């Protein structure tokens, strides 16, 4: 059988790994073995964090909505409950955007939510009876 020479393929493979790891620090960007190992970890982290990003954005939206809601004398959970009772279907992403960029529209939604809540829920803590 003829001898198979793979120098070209091996060099191409190494070059592609080193090119992909060009932004890493130290040996991880210069030595093939270290670069290959780091590349595997990097892809794992990227996969994991693409999924984690969704939860992080949801937390950010909730924090923004809660801050704006408290500025309008209502808590986050009462706001969400009131919007559900008023049958207003606005997701948290849009609510957070309104809270940041359009305070008047957000205040209108807060008014809708407050109107939809039962009377004893709107009372401050300690005064409900």
Swiss-Prot record:
Stated family: Belongs to the bacterial ribosomal protein bL20 family.
Organism for this UniProt entry: Rhodococcus erythropolis (strain PR4 / NBRC 100887)
Function as written in the Swiss-Prot or TrEMBL entry: Binds directly to 23S ribosomal RNA and is necessary for the in vitro assembly process of the 50S ribosomal subunit. It is not involved in the protein synthesizing functions of that subunit.
Any GO BP: ribosomal large subunit assembly
GO terms for cellular component: ribonucleoprotein complex; ribosome
HAMAP family for the chain: Ribosomal_bL20
NCBIfam families, alphabetized: rplT_bact
Record-given protein name: Large ribosomal subunit protein bL20
InterPro entries in the cross-refs: Ribosomal_bL20, RIBOSOMAL_L20_CS, Ribosomal_protein_bL20_C
Keyword tags: Ribonucleoprotein, Ribosomal protein, RNA-binding, rRNA-binding
